[in-house]
Amino acid sequence: AIPFCLWQTKDNNHRISLMANSIKHLPHHNNCIQVESDEDLRRSVTEHSIDAVVLRYSLDNLNIAEDLPSNVMVIMWSHNFIKRTELSRLAKDRRITCIVCVGNEQLQMYRDHQAFYKSVAIYNGYPINHFIRTQSCHISPFENRSNEVTFLGNLVDYKGFHLLAKAWKKILEAVPDAHLNVIGGGKLYDRNQKLGIWGIAEESFENMFMPYLLGDDGRLLPSVTFHGVMGNEKAAILNRTKVGVPNPSGISETFCIAALEMQLYGAIISTISYGGFKDTVYKTGDLYETPDRLAESVVKQLKKTDNDYSGVLDFVRLFDFSTVTKKWIELFDTLQQTGNIDSILKPKPTKEYRLAEWNRKFKRIIPFGSLLPSSMFYKSIFHRISSLLHKYACRKHNYPRI
């Protein structure tokens, strides 16, 4: 959506072209270019005298970037955490002018890596202002909501639903009338995925979380509803949700649209203090440090009586498309004037990332310092080991066969 918004922006300083493998469904526009192959891209860049190309980061696109004309600035737009080896390649590649992260926390993780010097943060976007104009007046008052908890996301292990499933019976002990809505499924992004016997998620993952949600009779707890993959109809569920739980593992979350969406519908958030959640969750949310605090966090949130909805709306405007596209235009202005991003101010290190900032400065002054691992590398390894231990604990218990 952001490329489309940029394409429609009335900007006298830049000619913004939208490249796509099919343009027949796009509005007629002189700056809409059909690109069906790598060769099409290279030819179009030359024919249309394009100065800079924005590519969504992937190894394939990195290889494509290396074949573009040497005078073309390449901006890599990274929606996911980048592996350290790939980050080093980006840092050394002179063709790559800029790496755009979709959140400040993602950028902070690269603070003591060489790639930090060519990286900036521009938030991902959402039609916030449109939602506020058309939907905010229909949002149910928080005090009128029952104890509904909602998970919104893909049912795969790295999205952490098994952690919420494991915590659910403990939540019920404290709040007996709580109800869990699960929106999403194992086929959210892969329609060909083979599902388990419950038809909910891939078999091995389904077998990991389902035992936590079954009663003594082997049937699904009445307090749990799997809604499957939903479109606009999910609005009715979100509008009665009290606590939203997006990806309680935090793995892969550089931004999290689901957190924004649930807050727009009036829910307060309970999830781990990691990655994009630190950017996208308002102060009414509860960000815990370790997954074993999930049940405690949800119970605490369910007992709240106010969601400060007006404060939420002020907070989320930061992520509206209009604000985000302005940041992109500012980046284009800087690159046009200087050819690099040296003049763009980087966010100051947070308390958590001061060690990374010290490490960055230390590595600059010692011989071969750039070869030392970044603190991001160690933190990522620790976080993944922690998640694997929790997954192992889920599988260790002897559950009834399902």
Which stretches of residues belong to each language-model region?
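Short hydrophobic beta-strand element within catalytic cores of glycosyltransferases
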Residues: 264-271
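C-terminal amphipathic helix plus adjacent low-complexity
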Residues: 317-402
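Acidic donor-binding loop of glycosyltransferase active sites
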Residues: 223, 239-254
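Nucleotide-activated donor-binding/catalytic signature segment of Leloir-type glycosyltransferases, i.e.
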Residues: 193-229
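A short, active-site helix/loop in glycosyltransferases that binds the activated sugar's phosphate group
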Residues: 85-90, 95-121, 126-133, 328
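Short His-centered aromatic/hydrophobic patch
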Residues: 55-60
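Conserved donor-binding/catalytic core segment of Leloir-type glycosyltransferases
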Residues: 100, 133, 139-172, 180-183
